Structures are given as C-alpha cells and as structure tokens.
Amino acid sequence: MKLPIYLDYSATTPVDPRVAEKMMQFLTLDGTFGNPASRSHRFGWQAEEAVDIARNQIAELVGADPREIVFTSGATESDNLAIKGAANFYQKKGKHIITSKTEHKAVLDTCRQLEREGFEVTYLAPQRNGIIDLNELEAAMRDDTILVSIMHVNNEIGVVQDIATIGEMCRARGIIYHVDATQSVGKLPIDLSQLKVDLMSFSGHKIYGPKGIGALYVRRKPRIRIEAQMHGGGHERGMRSGTLPVHQIVGMGEAYRIAKEEMETEMARLRGLRNRLWNGIKDIEEVYLNGDLEQGAPNILNVSFNYVEGESLIMALKDLAVSSGSACTSATLEPSYVLRALGMNDELAHSSIRFSLGRFTTEEEIDYTIDLVRKSIGRLRDLSPLWEMYKQGVDLNSIEWAHH
C-alpha cells in the first residue's frame, strides 16, 4: 500500500490508464491530430469521426441522442451555458429562477450574476439531511418562473435529489429544468429518455477522464433553446464555438464507455467500502454523519468530529488526501456553505471531513484510514481544553467567552 492514500475522488480522479492510452492516439503526427471542422481532407474527417464516436459513448451512458450533447471545457462552463443561455433566451417569458443553497458555486455564482442583470432568484434551503423539500419547491414556483436548477448528487455530502419528480413538476408548469450531474454521471443510473430534464451538465475529470473537458445535454424533444455564451465559428450547432479538443473528447468518451460497463459492480463495491469506513468510525464519541446514507451517493462520506478543529485534523491525517468542504472552496477558511445551509453551527461545520472513494480505493486503504482517524481524533481531543470541559459536563453553548 502506497502513502498518501487518495480519498478525494470528488475533487478529481486520476485518468484511467485505458483512457490515457486512447488519448495518446490523437496528439502527434502519426496519430489522428486533425481539426474535426476541416472538411476538405482525411485528417479532418478522421478527427470528426473520433468526435462522433465519443459523442455517442457519452449519449449512451445517459440515455440521450448524440445530437443533444454539446462539448464544453468542463462542468463549470456547462452550468454557465445552461443557466445564462436559457435565462437570456427565455427572459421575455419571465425573469424568475429557482435553485438551492447547496448547489455548486458554478450554479450559485451564475445565478448571482443574473441577479445583477435584473433576474430574480429564489434560493431554497434544504432539510437537515440535505434533501430539498418538494413542497417548498412547488410553493416557490410562479407564473414568471422560467428555470429551476437543482443538482443530482451534492459534491460535499453526497445526497441524491429526486430529479425525476422535480422534472415532472417543472414539465407540468412549462419550466425549464437544469441538473448539474457532475458527481452522479457514471455512478448512478441516468436515463434522459425517461427523465423530464431539459439541460444537464457533465464533466470528464470526475469519472476518470481528463480535466478541461465537459458536456451539456440540451434536450431536442421538446426543443430547448439556449443563447450561446462563447461566439466564434459556430461549432456545436451554434451553441459553443471553439475548435474541438479531439484528444480530450476521445478521453471523455472512453471514460464514459468504461463507466457504463463497470458502473453496477463498481458502485456496489464502493458502497461496501464506504459503509465499512462509516462502521469503523461511527462509534467514536460526538461523531456526526452529514447528509444521508440511504439517500446518498455510494462513494461519498462526510463526517463531523465535534471538538476537533478541521484544519488540525487534516494536518493530523497527512497520510490521507481528504478535504474539508469542496476543492473549489476549501482554499478559504470559511466553514462549508453546504453544511451551514443544513443548519449546522460553525464549530461542527469546521470539524467536518469529506472522504470520497473511487476506482482505485482498496479495502486495505479503508482499514488504514479507520485506524488513523481513530488514533488522530483521540490524540487531538487529549490536547483540547474544549473536549476536557465537555467531558466534565460543562455546557459549552452557555459559556460567555471573553473577547480580547
């Protein structure tokens, strides 16, 4: 077993060796290096064929028509294109958007930008377990609501929203529904031929493909229109201009093909490992599971260890690559906005760790992790005056701390 152990698969994944090998064939002179938009020679045709195959592989994993897949630079761009593109196109119908407080920043900050441009956004607070109350969602819908954006799987706590029911609710009212499926694609079944979802964002690097490539699903029946945000040569049916990066697209396609083949067995394996990890640490005193094991993605476990400072815990766990909060926001010292939206106090939110498991995680690594976490929590609490006071029965919430 090699240290450190990587348990941050929700931040990014290593490229699968099969994917890397495939990508290598699309870079150099002796490979397929052409521009897929070059129509006058075989270098272009071969590149275009490779892109078509990858587009099919992505569509097959999610039950879509390949013509509904638009390539982007990643899920952040897909979220921006979906939300800004739909809002701008349909703004004559209304200017009201609904989302939730626990969405990824790529959705939240896009909505903030639209607010500056005169749109009105309702931010729903989830229940304690992170799931959106559908009655609250229904109550928030208005005649001028044009778009709902609610994710499939949360990147920090792993809870799964009921996108099928939300889709039905939106379709019945003629509201466009966007789903950020970055954390769920290739891990949970998605069938867009059955789901009433209009726009869906995908990423390559969360499912063993390369970074810098993603896609946006744009429904054809009923046809959804979006306004381009990137202008140029009119690539991707006018929705996203820019030369297609064939090697990255091929990599994403291959990653999605592998995910489709291995999803069922791999998810059962990961669920087993995640449960093993939770069972190994859940009897530590003052340990709280954030999210919901039953309604959760099989590979994410978010836990708070009370009376332990999150940053010191991460340093104590230096042999584990884990995160407190998501990679996109863990550079700030603010506690996770997702956990705060669940109504958690700052102390608990600060002491949370996200373990996210993946394709190369082993049972041996999980057992090592359990052992290390137990030892580290014990050691850090031995040093903590707060823990000592808690053990003596002092109610820490009732203490008036002196401000120096």
From Swiss-Prot:
Pfam families noted in UniProt: Aminotran_5
PROSITE patterns: AA_TRANSFER_CLASS_5
GO BP term, pick one: [2Fe-2S] cluster assembly
Residue positions, PTM N6-(pyridoxal phosphate)lysine: K206
Binding site for [2Fe-2S] cluster: C328
Compartments where located: Cytoplasm
Active site residues per record: C328
Record's GO cellular component terms: L-cysteine desulfurase complex
Needed cofactors: pyridoxal 5'-phosphate
UniProt keyword annotation of Iron present: yes
MF-aspect GO terms: 2 iron, 2 sulfur cluster binding; cysteine desulfurase activity; metal ion binding; pyridoxal phosphate binding
UniProt keywords, alphabetically: 2Fe-2S, Cytoplasm, Iron, Iron-sulfur, Metal-binding, Pyridoxal phosphate, Transferase
Main location per the UniProt record: cytoplasm
Pathway membership, UniProt: Cofactor biosynthesis; iron-sulfur cluster biosynthesis
Family annotation (InterPro entries): Aminotrans_V_dom (IPR000192), Aminotrans_V_PyrdxlP_BS (IPR020578), Cys_deSase_IscS (IPR010240), Cysteine_dSase (IPR016454), PyrdxlP-dep_Trfase (IPR015424), PyrdxlP-dep_Trfase_major (IPR015421), PyrdxlP-dep_Trfase_small (IPR015422)
Description of how the protein assembles with itself and partners: Homodimer. Forms a heterotetramer with IscU, interacts with other sulfur acceptors.
Family according to the record: Belongs to the class-V pyridoxal-phosphate-dependent aminotransferase family. NifS/IscS subfamily.
Designated name of the protein: Cysteine desulfurase IscS
Gene for this chain: iscS
